[in-house]
Every structure is written in C-alpha cells, then in structure tokens.
Design a protein with these regions (language model features):
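N-terminal secretory targeting signals
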Residues: 1-2
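Stable alpha-helical elements in mature extracytoplasmic
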Residues: 85, 127, 132-136, 210-214, ...
Length: 329
C-alpha cells in the first residue's frame, strides 16, 4: 500500500469511487458506450443548439465540408473555443500539410505500443520535472484541436488563442518548430499548475506537478475532474479504478495516473512521483502515454506492485487517478 493511500484511508476511510453505486454507474456507462455519442459529440450538439441560426448553419457546413475529418471540428466546438475560431480552423484545413493534419487529427499518432512522433519529433517531457505538464499537454491537444494546430504549425484560430498557447507565447524564447512549441506548451502548463499550487503560495517547480492541480486545471471538453487516492494493494480498488477508466475511455476521455513505488525504495518513493495518461484499452489491459519515453506502453493494472513497469516510467505502483466528475459527463 502506498503511503498516500494509507494516509487517505486514515483521514477519509473508503473513497466514493469504489462504492457499489459508483462501480455500477461506471459499468452502465461502459455498456451504453457503443450506442451513445461520445463526450465531444454531446458537447458539440449542445453548443450548436445554443448557437445563433447563422452560426449553427456555418458550423454545420464546416462539419459537412471536412467529411471524414469532421471530428476535428466537433472537438474544437466542444473545447469551448469561440465559434469564429472554429470556422477559421475549418476553412484552413485544406491548406495544412499532411504532417500537421495528422497531428491535429490524432496527437497520439498511434493506438498500439510504440513512440509518439510528429515530424520526427518524439513527444517526450521537456525535463525531469514536467511529466505532469507533458501528460496534461497531451490530454489538452487530444481535446482541443486549436492547441494541436498551434503545436503542429504555429497557426492560430484568428485572434483567438487558447489560454495555454497564450501563456506559451508570453514566455517568449525561440518558438519556431514543432519541438519548440511542444516544449514551450509543457513549460507554460508547468508554470500554470505550480503558480498557486499551495493556495496563494507557489508550489516548488522542482517537485513537479501537485496532483490536486491536475484535478482543477485539466481542460477537456468542458468537463470537471476529481482526484482519487488509490490503494493498489486492494483488488477491489484496482477493479474500481479499471471500471472507471474503461468507462471514461469509452467516452473519449483519457485518465491521468500518478505512479509511485514501494517503501523499500525509500520514503520519498511512496508518494506520487510520476504522471502517465491512460489513452486506450488493449484487451484486459490499457495503453498508457508515458512522457519520459514519449511512447505508448501496455499497462496491466492487475500486475501492479511487482516489477517496475515501463508504462509507469519504471515505477510499480499507482497512487492517484484523475477521473471526470459524474455530474458533468
């Protein structure tokens, strides 16, 4: 059991995510997923319904015009971007080169184990403290094509800049290539999550990303998120985590996980140490984006606690997960 989970149990007992009601709801959502529009489609539909007739007509035309790439527009609408920025993205789509289109279409670039690469750039974390920022940046690009567009090409949706891109621009420095923009986005997110990490007091950047900041600063399809402590030595908690993760992924929502180690490696190893992102299901296991390698790895939650796992950045425990709040799904 991780020290964090032990402390959480002492303070709060059993957590809500492993309750029978929560597990049942996750199972119901997973069963319904094949016949239910995903989170992007649902949020997009709500925004279109609320739009003016003229805006709705323009956006429906953009969705139709992009054909098989219509999900890019759908995700942009669901991101909360101004509708004119979405229209600019749609109008510019045909002028993008194939590499830029591929990155915007699918920032992961694959759905099997292996490196995540864009134009010969591997999507690794920029330094040893930005695993959380890299994970948040990857999730952000999966949910917001306008962020992915900027990383891919430096282009913007007209005068609109997603807040994370604005902060990356404000940081300054040489931002000329895909690698430059990917690194700058991570650093901007790292600045953001540590700025008020302890209320009014900054969190020391050398300590990485505090888990509670991933909860409240993750921006994805207008959802809100909650952090949950995980005791991966308990089979019921691992099963509950897997059920919630499968339900979220079936809805198009990635799941950040904090990895840790055993107390035998020292007290500093048992607190959350590294952040990865569950991005898909692979049979009985999951696919995780691991930022130190910049690759997707297979992760079997049922095998935690043994040999260090590449999917966890060579840690062997899971201590914390970030899940979408039920009422917003």
């Amino acid at each position: 059991m991780s020290l964090a989970a032990r402390a959480g149990r002492a303070l709060g007992g059993r957590r809500a995510f492993i309750s029978e009601a929560a597990a049942s709801r996750a199972a119901t959502l997973l069963d319904a997923a094949p016949d239910r529009p995903d989170v992007f489609a649902r949020v997009c539909a709500r925004r279109l319904e609320a739009a003016s007739p003229a805006d709705r007509k323009a956006l429906e035309a953009a969705l139709s015009e992009l054909g098989n790439d219509a999900p890019v527009v759908e995700r942009a609408i669901a991101s909360g971007a101004p509708l004119d920025a979405v229209a600019i993205l749609a109008a510019a789509w045909d002028s993008l080169d194939p590499d830029a289109k591929a990155l915007v279409r699918d920032p992961l670039s694959r759905r099997d184990p292996g490196p995540v690469t864009w134009s010969r750039v591997t999507a690794t974390q920029v330094n040893q403290t930005t695993c959380g920022a890299a994970t948040m940046a990857m999730m952000l690009m999966m949910g917001d094509p306008l962020v992915a567009l900027w990383v891919a090409s430096g282009r913007r949706g007209g005068p609109y800049l997603p807040p994370e891109v604005f902060e990356a621009d404000v940081r300054g420095g040489a931002i000329h290539t895909v690698a430059d923009r990917w690194d700058s986005l991570q650093l901007a997110i790292h600045d953001r999550v540590t700025r008020h990490g302890l209320g009014l007091v900054p969190w020391p950047q050398a300590y990485g990303t505090p888990p509670w900041r991933v909860n409240n600063l993750t921006r994805f399809a207008g959802l809100r998120f909650r952090g949950v402590l995980v005791d991966d030595a308990r089979a019921d908690e691992v099963a509950a985590l897997a059920a919630h993760a499968r339900a979220a992924l079936a809805d198009g929502i990635p799941v950040p996980l904090y990895a840790s180690g055993d107390s035998a490696r020292g007290l500093d190893s048992v607190v959350p140490r590294h952040v990865v992102l569950l991005v898909g299901v692979d049979g009985d296991a999951f696919l995780a984006y691991e930022p130190s390698s910049g690759a997707l790895h297979r992760l079997d939650l049922g095998a935690l606690g043994g040999t260090p796992a590449a999917a966890l950045g060579n840690w062997n425990r899971v201590a914390w997960a970030v899940l979408p709040k039920v009422r917003d799904r």
